[in-house]
Each structure stands twice: as C-alpha cells, then as structure tokens.
C-alpha cells in the first residue's frame, strides 16, 4: 500500500520539450504529471493507454466498473485509455499477481492460452502515464507484479526502472542468463547501445546485462513463448 489518496495517484511519462526528454519514472516527470492531473488535464488521453486482461476495477466513488467486469467475465483483453483509468480508485486481480510483458504478441498469446485464469498487462515500450497509473493502483491493492522485459539495453533499463518504481512486491520474470541464451538472435547491438548497460545497477539483472555485453546481440521474447505461457 502506498498510503496515497486516489486523487494523488500519479505516474510519470515521456515528454519532449525543448529537445529534452523527461524520464517517465523520474521525480521531475512525476511532479509534472501530478500537476496536470490535479488540474484535470489528461495528456494525450486517447493514444495514452494500457493493454490489460482479467483485471477488475472500481470507480473512485466505490462502484464497480461494469465494463471491466464484463471483460473479466468474458476473459477478454482490453485497451484502456488514460481518460478511463483516471476515474478508477481501485483494482484487483486473480491471486493478487499481475504478469507484465513488453511484447504485444506475447501478451496476446498469454491472453489466448490463459484466458480467464491470470491477469496480464502489456507495457509495449516506454511506460505511458496510463500504465504507471495502473501500477500505482496495483501497488495499493497489494498485487505482486512479475515483469518480463526485452533482452536488449533499452529493455533492461525499462525493466529496472519499472521494478524500482513499483511500490509493492515485484520480481523479474524469465530475465535470467539462461532465458537470454534461449532467446538470443543474430541481431547485433551497437557499441553505443551496449554502453547503456553500464546503467544497470540491480544485482538481479547484472548477470544477463554482462552476457548481453559479451555476445553483443539482442534476444527475442517470441523464442520464450512457451515459458511465458507456462506462467512460472
């Protein structure tokens, strides 16, 4: 639990201003988002969305969100825009566990194979404000997140940022050296991009970061599809 009131639940987002990038998980980004939300301004509320499945939601006044309950009953995934998420005050999911993946095709496969049996979310690149709002609600609900990121410098950095940001229990999901070895491709990573791995500080990610640096190639999540579907 974060101890914050629903109106104070804010995330962070990427914003380009005067050619400077605001980190979506930085304090500066959070302050900016907080100011906009308190003013009732939703930035890019249509294209700013998150993709989720099997998550129940309640509005800030305490009434269930009928639409989300319907999607849960059908076991279908749904793309929820920021304008809807901003009205939520609470969420919950099966077994208090939320599986998060980067790749939309992996998300779709999990939703199809595990329909109605587990909650899942697709981050799909840099975290949008909508995704961060959902993470804040998940933390308040005592939900544990299991995060599977991409096996390249950008993917590892996003994974680390999300885990560090999350206020509840969190774990890296299939992010080991063994997983990378199984997923690796022939796609070369430039030296400039490999240098980004120096910013990996979480001890749990250091082994895979070092292996990616040694081999200099990216890994494809699609090659781990059976592991993701197994949900272990």
Residue ranges and their predicted role:
Residues 165-171:
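Structural alpha-beta junctions
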Residues 1-122, 127-140, 154, 161, ...:
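Nucleic-acid enzyme cleavage-core boundary/entry regions
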Residues 99, 121, 146-148, 171-173:
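Hydrophobic/aromatic beta-strand patches that form the interior of the parallel beta-sheet core
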Residues 142-152:
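Acidic beta-strand-to-loop metal/phosphate-binding motif
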């Amino acid at each position: 639990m974060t101890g914050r009131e629903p109106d104070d639940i804010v995330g962070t987002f990427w914003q380009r201003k005067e050619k400077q990038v605001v980190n979506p998980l930085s304090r500066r980004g959070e302050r900016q988002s907080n100011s906009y939300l308190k003013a009732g301004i939703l930035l890019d509320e249509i294209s700013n969305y998150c993709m989720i499945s099997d998550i129940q939601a309640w509005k800030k006044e305490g009434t269930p969100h009928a639409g989300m309950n319907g999607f849960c009953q059908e076991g279908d995934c749904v793309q929820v825009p920021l304008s809807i998420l901003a009205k939520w005050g609470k969420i919950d999911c099966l077994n208090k566990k939320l599986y998060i993946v980067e790749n939309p095709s992996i998300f779709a496969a999990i939703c199809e194979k595990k329909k109605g049996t587990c909650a899942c979310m697709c981050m799909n690149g840099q975290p949008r404000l909508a995704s961060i709002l959902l993470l804040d609600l998940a933390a308040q609900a005592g939900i544990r997140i299991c995060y599977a990121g991409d096996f390249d410098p950008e993917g590892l950095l996003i994974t680390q940022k999300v885990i560090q940001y999350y206020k509840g229990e969190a774990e890296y999901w299939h992010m080991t050296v063994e997983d990378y070895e199984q997923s690796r491709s022939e796609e070369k990573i430039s030296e400039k991009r490999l240098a980004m791995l120096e910013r990996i500080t979480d001890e749990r990610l250091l082994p895979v970061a070092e292996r990616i640096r040694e081999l200099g190639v990216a890994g494809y999540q699609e090659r781990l599809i059976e592991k993701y579907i197994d949900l272990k």
